[in-house]
Amino acid sequence: MQICLMDETGATDGALSVLAARWGLEHDEDNPMALVLTPQHLELRKRDEPKLGGIFVDFVGGAMAHRRKFGGGRGEAVAKAVGIKGDYLPDVVDATAGLGRDAFVLASVGCRVRMLERNPVVAALLDDGLTRGYADADIGGWLQERLQLIHASSLTALTDITPRPQVVYLDPMFPHRQKSALVKKEMRVFQSLVGPDLDADGLLEPARQLATKRVVVKRPDYAPPLADVATPNAIVTKGHRFDIYAGTPLTE
């Protein structure tokens, strides 16, 4: 995959070359998207819209830390949707990891989550965030136990994953209508890189075959159900709904 690669660390240790080789990235000087190694983190920038700033994964500070400390925890809609109740903390495969926010929420309340991400740039951002998170004295211990990254396409990986999870979570990219500054900024940068998930409909059936309990699909409230498969089971929040489908129980 071609992208502009930039190193702003001032170091001469070849870290950017190692990163490019690991994720299969080629430097393209004229690419409007840039992956930038800064002294703090790895970030994605849209070079023709510098005011949008950089997108990076931060599990330790910022909005994620605030959500972990002061958010709804088990009361969050995503936690309810995957079926967390009492001592039941399902094993989850997040098949469309993105920036890892929902996966982190589930991990922070006790679920083991395997994140799948096929885009190498997004996977590199997630890996950078995980590396910093794993090293953090406060959250590193449980984060290493509960949150892992698998760089692979969900369309193929969903048939290969073992052991089978109880829940598969899907949040395919869908064009956003909201005008909120955060969504606008992040989605403009993000969609410029990955575009809409045009093949997302193909995820529902393999997800249902893989999950032993349920599949949860997050959709904007104005979006049709994934693959046009309606379900009476949904958790509705402001602006979104979590459609819930039955999985395929383990056979004895």
UniProtKB/Swiss-Prot annotation:
CDD domains: AdoMet_MTases (cd02440). InterPro entries: 16SrRNA_methylTrfase_J, SAM-dependent_MTases_sf. Its main location: cytoplasm. Pfam families: SAM_MT (PF04445). Gene3D superfamilies: Vaccinia Virus protein VP39 (3.40.50.150), YhiQ-like domain (3.40.1630.10). It comes from the Bacteria. Keywords: Cytoplasm, Methyltransferase, rRNA processing, S-adenosyl-L-methionine, Transferase. One of its GO terms (molecular function) is rRNA (guanine-N2-)-methyltransferase activity. Its EC number is 2.1.1.242. It is an enzyme of class 2 (transferase). It is found in: Cytoplasm. Belongs to the methyltransferase superfamily. RsmJ family. HAMAP family: 16SrRNA_methyltr_J (MF_01523). NCBIfam families: PRK10742.1. Specifically methylates the guanosine in position 1516 of 16S rRNA. This is Ribosomal RNA small subunit methyltransferase J. It comes from Salmonella newport (strain SL254). The lineage of its organism: Bacteria, Pseudomonadati, Pseudomonadota, Gammaproteobacteria, Enterobacterales.
